[in-house]
Design a protein with these regions (language model features):
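Alpha-helical transmembrane segments
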Residues: 5-7, 11-35, 39, 195-207, ...
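Juxtamembrane/transmembrane-helix boundary motifs in multi-pass membrane proteins
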Residues: 6-14, 103, 107, 126-131, ...
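Functional transmembrane core segments of multi-pass inner-membrane proteins
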Residues: 18, 131-239, 281-290
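Membrane-proximal soluble regions of multi-pass membrane proteins
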Residues: 35-107, 261
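Interhelical loop and helix-boundary elements at the membrane-water interface
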Residues: 82-85, 99-109, 147-159, 199-212, ...
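Short microdomains enriched in Cys/His and/or Lys/Arg
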Residues: 90-131
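Structural signal for the C-terminal ends of transmembrane alpha-helices
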Residues: 124, 146-150, 170-174, 249-251, ...
Length: 290
């Protein structure tokens, strides 16, 4: 019996396998969230030197998602293999560096746990098949983008655009929706927030939404089609408004303080992709139009 046959015939094994892989991916996403913004900043600095015709900076050490090896940001202690086991290492080390005893951010085990649970749920929801595998990839990408946007107010094109093209390619085979719906989902997703951006700017003279949000909604439209866009925009706006007010209260910040919108779009789009049809059907039934 092949591995594919075993996983397709044993749903629990597929869910557990997806959860374990999700834990490992979550550990890697911690690296992506930490390093990718720094890598982009380096790239932008080099581009700025070229555009402004400034003297070239001395080349620094190699810095990417692989090198240098992970180390403690406080003392520089190189993280060994046994110290990098998802969740377990954090518990074994009691949340502190083995060298300097500095506290390790709780974001690392929480990201690993969230990714593992998310992966297991996707596997359970879809069952073994291409849909589950591709939604896993999408979920990992959305999690990374959400964490980066929450911390840096940045949605990197290097994450958003490949996923948008992947959605279009997958739907050229009709994996989730037709290519026609996916294409217009991408176009409408971008144009919807682009229109809101310029209307808000004309009225207030301020930027209300980032360009990364346009691309993120376009990417979600490429996966789920134009049909999921109204629900995605509505859910993200409601959740963003509620949580935004709560965060502003907790931080004692002003209403002009910028808040990232990407995480709310990501959550709403993920929900709409998985349950959009059921939620819409329930709504029409609730209002008596079905």
């Amino acid at each position: 019996m092949s591995l594919n046959e075993f996983l397709s015939l044993n749903p629990l094994a597929f869910v557990m396998t997806a959860g374990l892989i999700g834990l490992l991916i979550g550990s890697f996403l911690n690296v992506v969230v930490w390093r990718l913004p720094k890598m982009l900043e380096r790239e932008w600095r080099l581009q700025a030197h070229d555009v402004l015709d400034l003297p070239a900076e001395a080349p620094g050490p190699t810095y990417n998602l692989i090198l240098p090896h992970s180390e403690c940001p406080h003392c520089g202690h190189r993280i060994r293999v046994w110290e990098n086991i998802p969740i377990l290492s954090y518990l074994f080390l009691r949340g502190r560096c083995s060298s300097c005893a500095a506290p390790i951010s709780k974001r690392y085990p929480l990201t690993e746990l969230a990714c593992g649970l998310l992966s297991a749920f996707v596997a359970w929801h879809f069952g073994f098949g291409w849909q589950a595998c591709m939604v896993l990839v999408l979920s990992w990408g959305l999690l990374a983008m959400s964490l980066i946007d929450a911390e840096h107010q940045l949605l990197p094109d290097v994450l958003v655009m490949p996923l948008m093209w992947l959605g279009l390619v997958l739907n050229s085979f009709g994996l989730f929706v037709s290519l026609h719906d996916a294409f217009w989902g991408a176009v409408a997703g971008y144009m919807a927030l682009w229109t809101v951006f310029w209307l808000f700017k004309l009225v207030t003279g301020k930027d209300g939404i980032g360009y990364g949000d346009f691309k993120l909604l376009a990417m979600l439209g490429a996966w789920g089609g134009w049909q999921i866009l109204p629900m995605t925009i509505l859910l993200s706006s409601l959740v963003g408004a509620i949580l935004g007010v709560i965060l502003l209260r907790l931080r004692d910040a002003k209403t002009s303080t910028p808040l990232p919108f990407g995480p709310y779009l990501a959550i709403a789009g993920w929900i709409a992709l998985l349950w959009g049809g059921q939620i819409t059907g329930f709504y029409w039934q609730f209002v008596g139009l079905k």
